Design a protein with these regions (language model features):
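Structured, active/binding-site neighborhoods that engage oxygen-rich ligands
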Residues: 1-268
């Protein structure tokens, strides 16, 4: 099964290495958490919003508040995004000018749902600007949604790379090994979106892509979510069934219901 599950698995596997970082490509890929990752919850909130509302900005705020407060747990409570934690906990409704990589991660379902590049960009902006109204926060979300849309619609890696370089001004010519040597933990769109793309661009399979993203030693869960989403959008790449089963076995029924419904409606 491909689709947003590629992002959920990537984030879940990367979660163990968000704090305890690794540069080892052959890291342990087993997922042993009893709950979905914080990134996965935000992704599900977006999918729920796209399927079950009129897709207004206020309804998206409500969906994020609902899902993120429902799964408010432990040290992985929305990573290092302190402002977002407060925004969720206090049920705030105003943006705070962030350009953190959360906007680029939670937008992933938009890339599957959108019927055109323009629609992907339009709705990516809506999902970003409720919190991440900084230009780089919006651009990161649009870059990810439009990349997923383009991959799904058969554009080649080189075509997508050229588009991102032209429209988003990202430097995507950095060799993967050079990126890995210098990559640091920095939870911003300008840092994470190009890095995630470079991992996918240089990958040969879904697992290879996620391993490359996690072993950058950066914001492992979010970068693996984005890179995994790119890989899963490619019809020539299969998300391994054993990874899907391993990651989702403990997830709640309501979480899985949204995941399955979105797959049936938009990912086939």
């Amino acid at each position: 099964m491909n689709g947003i599950i590629g992002a959920v698995i990537g984030s879940s596997i990367g979660l163990s290495y968000e704090i305890k970082k690794t540069k080892d490509y052959n890291f342990n890929m087993i997922y042993d958490k009893a709950n979905p990752s914080d990134d996965s919850v935000a992704i599900i909130a977006t999918a729920d919003w796209l399927m079950n509302t009129n897709r207004t900005k206020d309804e998206y705020i409500d969906k994020l508040h609902y899902w993120c407060n429902k799964f408010n747990y432990g040290m992985y409570n929305y990573g290092n995004a302190t402002k977002f934690k407060e925004w969720v906990a206090n049920k705030e409704r105003e943006p705070y000018n962030s350009y953190g990589n959360g906007s680029a991660m939670r937008v992933i379902p938009v890339g599957w749902w959108a019927c055109s590049l323009e629609q992907a960009a339009k709705f990516a902006k809506i999902t970003a600007e409720i919190t991440h109204n900084h230009p780089d926060g919006i651009l990161g979300a649009q870059a990810v949604a439009c990349t997923i849309w383009a991959i799904r619609n058969g554009y080649s890696k080189d075509d997508v790379k050229e588009w991102l370089e032209h429209e988003c001004k990202y430097d995507l010519d950095i060799p993967y090994d050079t990126l890995k040597k210098h990559h640091k933990f920095e939870c911003t769109c300008p840092n994470s979106v190009p890095a995630s793309f470079i991992c996918w661009y240089n990958s040969t399979s879904y697992e290879d892509c996620v391993r490359k993203a996690v072993s950058l030693g950066g914001d492992a869960d979010t970068e693996a979510a984005i890179a995994g989403a790119f890989a899963a959008a490619d019809e020539q790449t299969e998300v391994p069934e054993e990874l899907t089963s391993d990651v989702t076995r403990f997830f709640s029924m309501d979480f899985m219901d949204v995941l399955k419904k979105f797959h049936n409606e938009y990912e086939k």
